[in-house]
Amino acid sequence: MSPSQNPPADSAPDSHCSSCGAPYEEGVSGWPRTCASCGAVAYRNPLPVAVALQPVYDIKGTALVVITRTIAPARGGIALPGGFIDHREDWRRAVVRELMEETGIDAASRDVRLADAMSSPDGHLLLFGLLPERPAAALPPPSATDETEGWHLLRTATELAFPLHTVAARAFFEGRYV
C-alpha cells in the first residue's frame, strides 16, 4: 500500500476502503460500495452485540444481574452485562465473556440459549443470551471492573440505560423467556 493510500488519522468514518486504504471517490455514498482502486466491495453490516440475562434467586425472589456503567455510552446508567461480539467469536461465548468481564461471574457458553434478537435504530444487532437461574449467594462479591462499578440485582422491570435492555428485562420479568 502506498503512503498516499493510508487514511489520515482525522478522516471521516467509512471514507476509505478497508481492504487497500484508498479513499472512496467523491460522491460515493450508500452501501454496498465498491473501491475504484482495488475493486473490493464493502458492506455496512450491523455490529453484533451479546447481552447476558443472568437470573438469580434468593429469599427475596428472582432477579437479574445488572451493572452500573463507568464508560460511555450511558456512563452511570444501569444495564445488562454485554458488549460487542469479537471477530469470529461464537455469540454464546461472547455472552459469557462479557458477563465475566463486567461482573466477574463465570458461566459456561454451552448453557446459554437465545432468548431474543433485536435490532436497534442505530444498526446494532443485539443477541440476548439466557443463562440458567442460579443462587445469588453463589455469585462472587460485586467489585468494580474496567467498565463497571460492579454488579447488583434488578428485581423488577425498570428503565435501563439502553432501550432494548429495558425491553428484554421487561420480557424476562413477564415470563416470556421461559
Question: Which residue stretches match the model-derived regions?
Answer:
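N-terminal strand-loop-strand
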Residues: 15, 30-79, 107
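Eukaryotic cytoplasmic intrinsically disordered
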Residues: 14-15, 130
